[in-house]
Every structure is written in C-alpha cells, then in structure tokens.
C-alpha cells in the first residue's frame, strides 16, 4: 500500500488518481499543524470575547441571524450533522468515498476552517483503516457545498450511521472500533467545517476526468486501428497541417496518431500507391476532433486540480488577522462547468468512434465485406453491434446537456442559485460506460477488419492492442452470440491497457 504525505494545497492529479484507484496510507505533513491550531485559537478567541460570528455561534442558512448560547454550541454542531444527513439513493462505492475523505482532509488541513487536528486525524485514521462511511449518491445541489453527503460522512465521527469495512456494513460504533477510534464531540465551527465544501462534487468530477482520460487513450488507439483496417491515409496526420492552424490539442493529437501509426507498416505499404484522394472525416479529421476533446479534458483537469487543493468552507477563519469572513467558496460552479466540458468531450469521443464503426460496415467506404463478415446474408456480422453503438451515442448526446445551466433555489431563497455540480459529475460515469462500450465495438470491428486484410500487420505500437483482443476474442468466421464479446472488450478497456501505448505527459493525470 502506497503512503501519500499530504502537504495541504499540493496534491497532484496523479496522487488523486492513485487515491481513487487504490487503498492508501495517508500521513499529514507537520507543516500543517501550526496553521490548524492557529485557526482553532482564533475561533476560541471569538467565543471568549463573545463576538458574533456566523457558523461559530449562530444558526445556519436563513437562520444565520439567530445567536446561539455558549452552552448550546456543542449541541449545535451535532445537530447540523444529524439534520443535514438527508441524502438518498445507493451508497457511493469505497473508491469515491476514499477520494471524498482525502479531499476533505486536504481542505481542512489548510488551516482556514477552525477545526481541531484531532478531528482531521480521525478522518485520516478512517482512511488508513479502510473504514468508509455510508454516503448516498444523491442529495446535493453543489451549493452551499455538498451538505447532505458530507453530513453522512461526518455521522461516523459522531458514532452515528454506518460504514463499510472490508465489504461489510457495520454500525458506526463497531466501524469506529475497527479503526481504534471513539465517537467525537465536535466543538464550535467543526460541524459546519466538515459539511461545507465541494469535495463530493470534485470527487464525482475527478472520477469522470480519469475515465475520460482512459477513454481518450483507447479511442486514439482504436481510431488508428480503424485507419489501417479501412486502408486510410497517414497524410492527414502530417505535422505541417496542424502547425499552421496552431491549436495545441490538435497538434498533440496528430503527434499521437503519428506515434501510434508509425512511419509505415505492412498495411500502409500495401496501399500507398492507391488512387484514393481523401478519407472520410471520421478518419481524416481525428486530430481536429480529438484535439478539441483533449483541450476540454485538459481545461477541466486544470480546474479540478485547483479545486482539489482549495478551501471551500464557509465561513473562513483568517487567524493572522483574527477575522472570520463569510463568502461563497462552497459554490461549485467551476466544478460543474468543468464536468460539463468533460461531458462534451466524452460525447464527441463516442460519436467519432461510432462514425468509424459505421464506415467499416459500408463496403464502398471500407473496401471490406459488408458488416465485416464473409458469406453475408447467412451471416449478419457486425450489423446490430453498430446499431448498439448508435443507440449509446444518442444516449450520450442527451446526457451531455449542461448541468450547470440548471438551478433551483433552496433554503427559503437564501441559497437562491446553485451549481448542480454533483449531477454534472455523476452523469459522466454513465456517459463513460456508454463510450467504453462504443469503443469496445470499434475495437472488435477494427480487429475483424484487419484480419480480413489477410494477415497484413499494422504498426509495431498498435499490434499489441490487436493481439490483446485476440487473446480473449476470436475472429468472426460466422455469426455467434455477440454481447459477451462486447463485454470482454469493454472490461479490457476498463483495465487501462491502452494508456501504456500513449506518449508520456499527453494526459494530465497520467
């Protein structure tokens, strides 16, 4: 198990990808201790001076003008956790919960939240022990923070709710015991600090980012396999074409295709003197389309990297000046828009792949047997697999509608504009699954097309992708039950083998 030392505000996307994909051991760098304690001291000074400060000794939301008596402050913090734990739906899986918890730890440890080191260390202990609180998928609108899901996370610290340990749901007290912890009593400001923040929105979008990167890599590889299967030209990937336009994503995408296709292969040499002038757009314009998608992925990654290191609590404690300021860092609009950009990229990656699949079905376009099968008529080949790809592509067009343009007022109109960032991030998972299956069909089709070229080999870099599939799925010499082959190919894509074929540093978290 990898140990990751958190230096608050310095987590990388590579760290976050690892935390999402693997159990980890977290330690907190000692440089965080002083700022954390200073923020706690500032809160205590405000209480000692009997100053009124939102979130410390007042109610919340529309009840912010209600002053809370000192003897009720601990009960206030417990009450906010209990009352706000109102999420619904299935539980998030362990990977997402682990990512949420580490994002919350990273934010609290910046020292602007007025929360004790003891509470932060309790969250770290839970992560290290593999004890994951029950956090429902639904219930947040992404402002004021991800209140409901983070309240469910915080219930466990109070000895309430339930948690999963080694795949089994346990009552909170039992789960805490597995980590060697006792229930905590939260002090002033701490309940609100735990609940307020964009960590759930960010975690949902980060999963979408990681899947978008993996699928971008797979689509690049399979797009090149299709170029060779359809006897496409390499000339559209010439660096000079892309340099004169100047779009960075396009330039990098074209470079990737040159890397994958190589200068020549048996297949490319077999048709280099053919009389075909231009390929269809789904082959020829891959750098332009995929380059634009790469730009969206990179832009979203930049936003999410910043947000993953952000302080999105409210109010914020500025201990050096002794100030507690109310603002709106809990509003997850940047995350929502980043997720919307990822949705556009995913939709287009899948759409372009479906176009290439359709091209291979057409004997006039691909110079391959109709539907990629011999003895057509008796055999239908890939006919309906292409229909499935079309159905999934259409689904993603609907799912790509921006979530960030929606808003519903909440909290008696005190919180009258919200981001819908959790929805923006969560729908990426469904889109990614659709794209994965579209790409699985293209992979199957491209390898079938290559096999129909009577053994001509593609490039040295692409051949391992072809061979990997053929280790699990055999050539279609006649019709057979098709769905299991799509599932096998999809699972292989999910194992991220195609990332290994990509140029270094092309994608932000790899």
Swiss-Prot record:
- Can you name one GO molecular function term for this protein? histidine ammonia-lyase activity
Cross-link 5-imidazolinone (Ala-Gly): residue positions:
143-145
Look up the domain of life of the source: Bacteria
Q: What are the UniProt keywords, alphabetically?
A: Cytoplasm, Histidine metabolism, Lyase
SUPFAM superfamilies cross-referenced by the UniProt entry: L-aspartase-like (SSF48557)
- Pfam families given in the database record: Lyase_aromatic
Q: What is its EC number?
A: 4.3.1.3
The identity of this protein, by name, is: Histidine ammonia-lyase
Native species: Yersinia pestis
The major lineage groups are: Bacteria, Pseudomonadati, Pseudomonadota, Gammaproteobacteria, Enterobacterales
């Amino acid at each position: 198990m990898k140990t990751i030392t958190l230096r608050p505000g310095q987590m990388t996307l590579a760290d976050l990808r690892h935390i999402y994909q693997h159990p980890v051991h977290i330690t907190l760098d000692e440089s965080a201790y002083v700022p954390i304690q200073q923020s706690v001291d500032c809160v205590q000074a405000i209480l000692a001076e009997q100053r009124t400060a939102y979130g410390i000794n007042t109610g919340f939301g529309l009840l912010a003008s209600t002053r809370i008596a000192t003897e009720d402050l601990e009960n206030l913090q417990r009450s906010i956790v209990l009352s706000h734990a109102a999420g619904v739906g299935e539980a998030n899986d362990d990977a997402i919960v682990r990512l949420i918890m580490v994002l919350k730890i990273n934010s609290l440890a910046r020292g602007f939240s007025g929360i004790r080191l003891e509470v932060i260390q309790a969250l770290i202990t839970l992560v290290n022990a593999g004890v994951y609180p029950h956090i429902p998928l639904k219930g947040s609108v992404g402002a004021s923070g991800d209140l409901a899901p983070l309240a469910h996370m915080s219930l466990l610290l109070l000895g309430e709710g339930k948690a999963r340990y080694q795949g089994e749901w346990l009552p909170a007290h039992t789960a805490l015991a597995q980590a060697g912890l006792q229930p905590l009593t939260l002090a002033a400001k701490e309940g609100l600090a735990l609940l307020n923040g964009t960590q759930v929105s960010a975690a949902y979008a980060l999963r979408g980012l990681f899947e978008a990167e993996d699928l971008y890599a797979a689509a690049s590889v399979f797009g090149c396999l299709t170029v060779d299967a359809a006897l496409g030209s390499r000339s559209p990937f010439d660096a000079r074409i892309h340099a004169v336009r100047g779009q960075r994503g396009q330039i990098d995408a074209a470079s990737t295709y040159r890397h994958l296709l190589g200068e020549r292969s048996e297949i490319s040499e077999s048709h280099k003197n053919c009389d075909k002038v231009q390929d269809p757009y789904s082959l020829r314009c891959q750098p332009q389309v995929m380059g634009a998608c790469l730009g969206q992925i990179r832009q979203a990654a930049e936003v999410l990297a910043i947000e993953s290191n952000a302080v999105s609590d409210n109010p914020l404690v500025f201990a050096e000046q002794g100030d507690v300021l109310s603002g709106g860092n809990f509003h997850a609009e940047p995350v929502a828009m980043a997720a919307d950009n990822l949705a556009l990229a995913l939709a287009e990656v899948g759409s372009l792949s479906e176009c290439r699949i359709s091209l291979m079905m057409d004997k006039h376009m691909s110079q391959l047997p109709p539907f990629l099968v011999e003895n057509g008529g008796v055999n239908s080949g890939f006919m309906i697999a292409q229909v499935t790809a079309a159905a999934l592509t259409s689904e993603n067009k609907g799912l790509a509608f921006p979530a960030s343009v929606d808003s519903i007022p909440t909290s008696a109109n005190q919180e009258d504009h919200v981001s819908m960032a959790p929805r923006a991030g969560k729908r990426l998972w469904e889109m990614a699954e659709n794209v994965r299956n579209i790409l699985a069909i293209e992979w199957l089709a491209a390898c079938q097309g290559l096999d129909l070229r009577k053994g001509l080999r593609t490039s040295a870099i692409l051949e391992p992708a072809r061979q990997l599939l053929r280790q699990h799925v055999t050539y279609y010499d006649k019709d057979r039950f098709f769905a299991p082959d799509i599932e096998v190919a999809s699972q292989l894509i999910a194992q991220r083998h195609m990332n290994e074929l990509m140029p270094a540093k092309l994608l932000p978290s790899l």
